[in-house]
Amino acid sequence: MTKTAAGMKRLIAALRKDQSPDGSWNYPFETGISTDAYMIILLRTLEMHDEKLIQGLAARILSKQEENGAWKLFEDEPDGNANATLEAYYGLLYSGYIEKEDARMKAAKKFIREHGGLESANVITKIMLASTGQYQWPESFPIPIEIMLLPLSFPFNFYQFSVYGRVNLAPILILSEKKFSLQTKNSPDLSDLLTTRARWEIQPEYRSLFSFLKEGVEELLGLPEQLHSLAMDRAKNYMLERIEPDGTFYSYFSSTFLMVFALLSLGYSKDEPVIKNAVAGLKSLRSDIDGLPHIQYANASIWNTSLINTALQLAGVSSNDPAVRKANTYLLKRQHVKFGDWAIHSPHAKPGGWGFSHVNTLNPDVDDTTASLRAIARSVEDNSEYQDAWDRGIQWLVSMQNEDGGWPSFERNTENPWLPFLPVEKGEYMFGDPASADLTGRTLEFLGNYTNLPAADPLVKNAVNWLFGNQEQDGSWYGRWGICYIYGTWASVTGLAAAGHSNHPSVRKACDWLKKIQNEDGGWGESCLSDSQNSYVPLNASTLTDTAWAIDAIIAAVDQPTEQIQKGIQYLLNSLDKEDWTTAYPKGQALAGSYYIHYHSYRYIFPLIALAHYHGKFGE
């Protein structure tokens, strides 16, 4: 057996071992300590005494503290992250399992104060602090609740925000309008973290935006008081109508956390079923890592299962293999049949996409849809059930293409020219869902390699032109949901190659860039600093996932194995058992500078895909 085949065999065996009885893979979707701290704060605020969970979460948070008292979002983040440290500090104190006078807490407090105190917190953290009585709400939030009433024709309306922006914004608007806060007799005192006064100031230019919107609503629709009440009801109903079967609001941690506080502000009791179900849903996001509980931001079972199932088949596992069949059955049961918010921007499309998690029934996305379609592709020909799922998935996917030719994540044509004017740091990430290189590239790769759509089709040509028009000067592409330029370049190159452009100057330039940044050990590695600095930052170490992405891109674009490919393949084969900080380094991001993801599955998926493509194209 060749070394490449042996490497693939080892990865396949590891994946087979980790498959769940229902056919899914449930590798952790690890997102730092923020959700763990918020879960403690939520349980303590609601006076739900799940001590075993709270103690476990506190232990996990403490295990991640740096020697200087701070918490980091990723290994090479300089010094630490003030916002994460504040969240950890608050969660630990509220847990009751560590005292303020503990040396570790003193070090954390010192770090927070040296980096701006409570005032330095990001907007979501400030909302959490205000909701739990630790910070004062601003006199007026930059976006008035009346935005809920503005018609789609208005230049600034609720549905111009991304879906993940809306689901967080609806409860925030209620909370800020009510200026709600809830403390308990055990609430920690964080006043010593204030460097000035606990006042959330909104700049004058944003207050004028607030007034403009409020006046616009009144002019369009009528009397202020009646509108106010109607807007509050609409925000409340927006939440309640989008609760998933597990009790979560759109299956996200943050939106569910905020919904609980918003409902409390509207007079719901802590014992209401909707509150209890929401908390139970958040608890179900638990995933144990190294013996300690972690509350995931979301469950990634559809993403994991579809990617792994595709990788197995690329590596030679038959579509009739029990592992593949079970996984496909799992995916088929979770194809969407309901209309969600996406239908507002695509009124002629019908349901047929897939979402990120197994409980997601309303919010499909382009990435999970192409991933699931790849997984079932080899089962379609002789099975009418799979053929129907395939046809519905394709039509939904095609309907999501933006007018600019690119693909967004969740909804088409939600470009919002107002986003730069909102006083929310990284608002373009939180509230925007523009086309991205990773979504567009992967969709092109799927259409080119898995369907009969010709390269001359306008849908393909427009996507290709979008990628050509959005390439960076150095030859790379920026990836929205991964780290970052290697990720975007991999998706773009493989997509363009599948569309017949492997010899295009843009693709050659991208491959030259990848070759230039290869490390001496044959691998590749990119820092999470890239996304906040808007340019490639090397990690100064190689990772399995980065290396797999880079190799896979070059393989797609060349006819013969190059020296760079050979060195990269050798790095992968020598590093499959690697266990160090690079293994746990985040490869995904959702909010630049604030929110990073360690997908535990990636170390298996992408090396297996790269090895399979290498073996299939070049042999040994």
Per-region residue spans from a language model:
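Preference for long, amphipathic alpha-helical scaffolds in soluble/luminal domains
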Residues: 1-620
